[in-house]
Curated annotation (Swiss-Prot):
This is ATP synthase subunit delta. It is a peripheral membrane protein. Keywords: ATP synthesis, Cell membrane, CF(1), Hydrogen ion transport, Ion transport, Membrane, Transport. Belongs to the ATPase delta chain family.
Length: 180
């Protein structure tokens, strides 16, 4: 059975994170993975090229050697394992999973807040503190998204949860109740 890219990303990311914790190097590995993510964003399609069966193995090896030369230890070995299993096209999902686990480990929750108008720094800080308390995290960082179509209120998305306090949703609920 072929695994989808999300399952592959979760498995490899989890394994790398557990190894990082065991070796007491979670922060260093995280920083190296951020560098790797940057390389992948600067060279779109790099993972697909390294996973392409039409490319000669020695050609891929040249590219791979250049890529791993910037990394040491665990990350270098991890890249070699991922390459040997022909999974370089799923590397960004592995990095995402590692980052999610790393943030959980640090007590940090990343999310977004959608509002009709921009929030002041003070409002955003209060909202982040409330979300941290509600979702039981030490720290929350919310990225602001302005969307006037929600009319008012806020929609917070974090950790696969949505807290919808928008006026638009409240009006839709009222309309549905009146139409019954």
């Amino acid at each position: 059975m072929k695994l989808d890219k999300y399952t592959v990303g979760r498995r490899y990311g989890k394994a790398l994170f557990e190894l990082a914790i065991d070796s007491n190097s979670a922060e260093e590995i995280y920083q190296e993975l951020l560098s790797l993510r940057q390389i992948y964003s600067e060279i779109p399609g790099l993972g697909n090229v390294l996973s392409d069966v039409r490319l000669e193995p020695h050609e891929k090896r040249i590219i791979m050697d250049k890529l791993v030369s910037g990394f040491d230890g665990i990350v270098k070995n991890f890249l070699e394992v991922v390459y040997s299993y022909n999974r370089m096209s799923e590397l960004s999902f592995m990095i995402d999973e590692y980052e999610h686990r790393y943030n959980d480990y640090k007590g940090l929750l990343l999310g977004s807040v959608k509002t009709a108008v921009p929030l002041s720094d003070e409002q955003l800080q209060k909202l982040e503190m409330n979300v941290a308390k509600t979702m039981d995290y030490q720290t929350v960082e919310l990225k602001q998204i302005v969307d006037s179509s929600i009319i008012g209120g806020a929609i917070v998305e974090a950790n696969h949860r949505v807290i919808d306090g928008s006026i638009r949703t409240q009006l839709e609920k009222m309309r549905n109740q009146l139409n019954r």
